[in-house]
Amino acid sequence: MAAAAAAGSLLLCLLGLALPGSALHTKGSVPLDTITFYKVIPKHKFVLVKFDTQYPYGEKQDEFKKLAESSGSSEDLLVAEVGISDYGDKLNTELGEKYKLDKEKYPIFYLFHDGDFDNPLPYSGHIKAGAIQRWLKSNGIYLGMPGCLKEYDVLASKFMSVTDKSERQSLLKKGQQSLEKAKETEKKSAEQYLKIMSKILEQGEEFAANEVVRITKLIEKTKMSDGK
């Protein structure tokens, strides 16, 4: 199942404990308060901030954890979170008021660009790691999926955007040349990119569509077997 999921990710690329006064820390995410919020955001090109209860849990928080851990693949993006409590010490309520946040709609995601505090871009889609990743990508942010490589993502994007066979052959050759310089830890993933690109060159666009169907069925079959 793991191998199928990894192959699926590459194909799609082609197409603690709480401290007093802070929210629970999530790996890959930076906890912010009313002071650090204004210090940290201007230092990064993009900052995705999750506004939530002080101690979030459940399925949506699990999706956020996946997203935060995957953010290490982006040089331009910082993932952060603000825990808001409207009782007791009433932590970070000023930020909730500033952005007119409805606690019934938590978690709420805002994307800040170039330190602009007044015009953040709100996310209104499903709280799923993959959906948020696609939204970030649509806003010009690179955020690789597991097993993906930025250099080959760019190459694959160019490959899929052209239809001329000679142009595709040229891009494939470029990828093969880059493979020789790739780190040992990246070679296996790079080879998968080249393998898929070669298949598309030989068989056409139908290969990608058929492969998605095949891998999806394989994953579903494995899940059914595991559930027995």
Curated annotation (Swiss-Prot):
InterPro entries: ERp29, ERp29_C, ERp29_C_sf, ERp29_N, Thioredoxin-like_sf
GO cellular component: endoplasmic reticulum; endoplasmic reticulum lumen
Signal sequence segment: none
Location in the cell: Endoplasmic reticulum lumen
Pfam family of the protein (one): ERp29_N
Gene3D superfamilies for this protein: Endoplasmic reticulum resident protein 29, C-terminal domain, Glutaredoxin
GO terms for biological process, alphabetical: protein secretion
Keywords: Endoplasmic reticulum
Subunit architecture: Homodimer.
Function in brief: Does not seem to be a disulfide isomerase. Plays an important role in the processing of secretory proteins within the endoplasmic reticulum (ER), possibly by participating in the folding of proteins in the ER.
Protein name listed in UniProt: Endoplasmic reticulum resident protein 29
Species: Gallus gallus (Chicken)
Gene that encodes the chain: ERP29
